[in-house]
Amino acid sequence: MKIKILSTGDEIVSGGVVDTNASWLAASLLGLGLTVDCFVAVGDDFGTLRRTIADLAAETDILIVTGGLGPTNDDITAEAAAGAVNTKTILNPEALGLVTDYFNRKGWPMNPSNKKQAVLPRDCRVIENEVGTAPGFYLRISGCHGFFMPGVPKEMKAMTLNWVLPWIQRYAAKNLGRTLTDITPRTITVFGLPESEVGARLKDLATQFPGVRPGFRADFPLIQVKLYPDSEKRGGGENILDQAEQFVVTTLGRWVISREGLTMEQEVGRLLVQKKATIALAESCTGGLMASMLTDVPGSSEYFIFSGVTYSNEAKIRVLGVRQSTLESHGAVSEETAGEMAQGVRRLTQATYGISTSGVAGPGGGSPEKPVGMVCIGIAGPGFCTTKRYGFAFNDRTMNKQIFAVTALGALRKRMLMQGGSV
């Protein structure tokens, strides 16, 4: 089943508005095992829009169009759709009734311009808009099934969930002999391997599991392995996805940090909650990035206590109690200093875990002994303090800070998993 998505509006093609509708639609269709062939966006030019609708409809089974159903002069989708099938628009009584009823329910006066939203192609089927004023419509365009919906996300989503997806499921069952059930794609988060290596290790995945379509998404420094049901080769549905997921986890082993698609900070937060543990941070080279990441997670107040950006040596001494002699003998960027920082912030806050970072983010400031990309990480906990030096080959300050922060959280994750149970 071929599906294409067309988004309309000058605001989209000019870059003024990010088209989130298309990505949401694609994700919703993937849950049924359906792949979108392409996204297309056009502005508010009648001729271009009419031709685009006709051209896309000629080469697809289903065309989903969003935008251009409002009450203003630049809302021209209904007229363009009518032009694509060489018909006229009419004031649709059913659509007019829906628009009028909406205003009556709200107790609002209806502007005469809103009648334009009921002017639809002749012979179309009206799709009710339960959360807005603009009805959508279904239109057969030669052999293509066209669905036209408003561009307002909440209105488009309601129509998709209540009308479009159920229609597609019925169509597939009746005409294609397939039952499209809603199956959640699997997302496995990986850290510590480049995307090319992940792909190489999983090169046989699609062959071994023909009912699964794998995908890879890099979100530095993490990689997400996506497993989608393939509607053309559905096979065992949930069962085949479960098998493929286990194959990925077994193949990638210790590089997998989450089978639920969690980020590193989300996974660390989950473990802290599970262990009823708390965390405090002493950040130098990461400049508060770890704190920002952790507190972006809803519910982080349950485990996050404190973060101090102890950038200078004086701050390390006065706030964390790092010894002057340690700094003089080993320098700020050293495992010795990182260890004392972690112990100091844990002592200061009485947190279960104290985490520290001290490194060279670059692009300048490195030396042969301590090059750009070097970071020392300390973790202090009940009865232990461990440190480790890491080296990365990035000469970009932002990338180094990101990978330093995720590496530090990853080190804590490993430590918590090693301990098992509660702290």
From Swiss-Prot:
InterPro entries: CinA (IPR050101), CinA-like_C (IPR036653), CinA_C (IPR008136), Competence-induced_CinA (IPR008135), MoaB/Mog-like_dom_sf (IPR036425), MoaB/Mog_dom (IPR001453). It comes from the Bacteria. HAMAP family: CinA_B. Belongs to the CinA family. PANTHER family: NICOTINAMIDE-NUCLEOTIDE AMIDOHYDROLASE PNCC, NMN AMIDOHYDROLASE-LIKE PROTEIN YFAY. This is CinA-like protein. It comes from Desulforapulum autotrophicum (strain ATCC 43914 / DSM 3382 / VKM B-1955 / HRM2).
